[in-house]
Each structure stands twice: as C-alpha cells, then as structure tokens.
C-alpha cells in the first residue's frame, strides 16, 4: 500500500509569478491568480497547507469586465457605525483604487479561514506597470 506524502514547510518551493492585467477579464484573471496562490497547479498540493506561490499583478487599472458591469457592478463597504454603508460603482472604484477590485475578486476565491488569509498575503497588486519585486525574478505568465 502506498503512503501519501505530505510536504513539510521546509520542502515547499515558492516561486514568484508576474501577471499583466491589461485587457484581461476580471473573473478569469482572478481564477488564475487564486489557483497559483493556493498551489493547486503543483503536484504537491495539500488542502490544509499553504503550498502556493507569490503573485505580482501589474496594470490593475486596465482590467476589464464584460457587459454592463462597468456601470452596474456595485462594491459595498461598511464603517461599522450606524448608517455607515458606502456603495460604489465599478467605474468609480477603478479610477480611485483599481488594486482593490482585483484583491476583492481573488479574496472571494480563496478559503474563508486563516489559511486563506495567509495565502492572500502573497498577492501583490499594483496600479501601473512598475513593481518593487524585481529582485525576486518573477516569471511572466502569458495567459
């Protein structure tokens, strides 16, 4: 009988990937990023361990959505105080904080527990084409 090999935290290799969000559909891009963050693309994937890679996303302000979502999709946040609900459309959030759009889409695709929070910390999103992670030699993903 074969034994399942569980990787230890010392043996897990973490790579850095660079994803360009220019002219990409939001949901398809977020799915791809969430897969890399969880480590589901690796043969050593283990559901209860953080086996994922680091992902750098550039050109967040150039991400697209299909149909009328640009004018109809709403983003909600609450200050925690009575009457503190703020509602913002995709268009205005894209102008103000485009990084938050991708972060929120990916965060919803990760586990909703401490493991998901740990995996989410490996996502780095930047508005323009520049990023401060050149020393990590990220691999460009063409998809």
UniProtKB/Swiss-Prot annotation:
Belongs to the universal ribosomal protein uL13 family. One of its GO terms (molecular function) is mRNA binding. Transmembrane segments: none annotated. The keyword Ribosomal protein applies. Part of the 50S ribosomal subunit. This is Large ribosomal subunit protein uL13. GO terms for biological process: negative regulation of translation; translation. It comes from Prochlorococcus marinus (strain MIT 9215). GO terms for cellular component: cytosolic large ribosomal subunit. This protein is one of the early assembly proteins of the 50S ribosomal subunit, although it is not seen to bind rRNA by itself. It is important during the early stages of 50S assembly. It holds the Pfam family Ribosomal_L13. InterPro entries: Ribosomal_uL13 (IPR005822), Ribosomal_uL13_bac-type (IPR005823), Ribosomal_uL13_CS (IPR023563), Ribosomal_uL13_sf (IPR036899). Keywords: Ribonucleoprotein, Ribosomal protein.
């Amino acid at each position: 009988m074969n034994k399942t090999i569980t990787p230890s935290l010392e043996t897990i290799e973490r790579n850095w990937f660079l994803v360009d969000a220019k002219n990409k559909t939001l949901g398809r891009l977020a799915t791809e990023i969430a897969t890399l963050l969880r480590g589901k693309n690796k043969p050593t994937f283990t559901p209860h361990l953080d086996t994922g890679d680091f992902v750098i996303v550039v050109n967040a302000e150039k991400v697209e959505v299909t149909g009328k979502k640009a004018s109809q999709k709403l983003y909600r946040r609450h200050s925690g105080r009575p009457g503190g609900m703020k509602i913002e459309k995709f268009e205005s959030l894209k102008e103000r904080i485009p990084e938050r759009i991708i972060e929120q889409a990916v965060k919803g695709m990760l586990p909703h527990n401490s493991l998901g929070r740990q995996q989410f910390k490996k996502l780095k999103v930047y508005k323009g084409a520049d990023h401060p992670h050149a020393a990590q030699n990220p691999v460009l993903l063409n998809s």
